[in-house]
């Protein structure tokens, strides 16, 4: 088929005129459409043979026509794609060249690069986290927050909103502050509990000697005054009395208890002491001081010796009413 009329050249179905593509033998060569030149049809081998024969001027005309054809294809593809998306169907539009999009028509390699960039952006978006700036509280704000924390460790939302308006802070910041303050308070409570357990450990309670059952019954049955309670309630002082001597080392070896003092008589002697009141300070006689020198005992250095000395004074106070009778 030979092309001799100019109107056929204006049509976009043919790319080159007959006189440009005639072979040297006079026979007309194959004519190619714009689709074949742009690569829509797989005729690359035939297209390569004619690229060398096309002049630069004709190449510019071909580029202009191809760009017009691409724009025309873009406008035709927009409306069918919208209708196709509304119907929810997939596939082609009945046109063998409809698989080519406008982006592929303009630049075939641009669509793949754009899709790769979109995928990389989607992968990077979850990794980005919004970092909140650290809130710096003023002295007034901390004072008001501490006062509110003393009133209630768990304020409700209305109290938090009122406090937030008072200290000019967002309610979320006030809530976070109370959470951190409660955590700090729990840590302090745990430290206090552990310190109390260390104080009450058995290593520190070995000095506490249990009281004998007989002495506890005696002290509970006797109506003693407050000034007699400390020495009698102490087991060390009670063991130093003559009626409760269990070891020979509790009193000096030269001391012998008087014959009128025994456990039975001591109970009768202690009964009228509740009505007598506190006795006057007892003055030891000269013979007693000479027999038991007190200079050898230092109450400030030895607590046991001081308790023994108090026990001796009570023993002498018990024996004095019997001697007068």
UniProtKB/Swiss-Prot annotation:
Name the residue ranges of motif: Nuclear localization signal: 308-312
Pfam families recorded:
Homeodomain (PF00046), OAR (PF03826)
The alphabetical list of record keywords is:
Developmental protein, DNA-binding, Homeobox, Nucleus, Transcription, Transcription regulation
Per the record, the coiled-coil ranges are none
The main location is: nucleus
Where does the secretion signal sit in this chain?
A: none
Region Disordered: list its residue ranges: 75-136
Q: Domain of life here? A: Eukaryota
Quote the biased-composition stretches of kind Polar residues, using this chain's numbering.
Answer: 99-117
Where is this protein localized, as stated in its record?
A: Nucleus
Biased region (Basic and acidic residues) positions are: 75-87
Expressed in which tissues: Highly expressed in anterior neural plate followed by neural retina, pigmented epithelium, in pineal gland, diencephalon floor and epiphysis. At later stages, the neuroretina remains the primary site of expression. No expression in the developing lens and cornea.
According to the UniProt record, one GO cellular component term is: nucleus
The entry's DNA-binding region feature spans: 130-189
Location of motif OAR in this chain is 302-315
The family annotation for this protein states: Belongs to the paired homeobox family. Bicoid subfamily.
Its protein name is Retinal homeobox protein Rx-B
Say which species the protein is native to: Xenopus laevis (African clawed frog)
Name the gene for this chain: rax-b
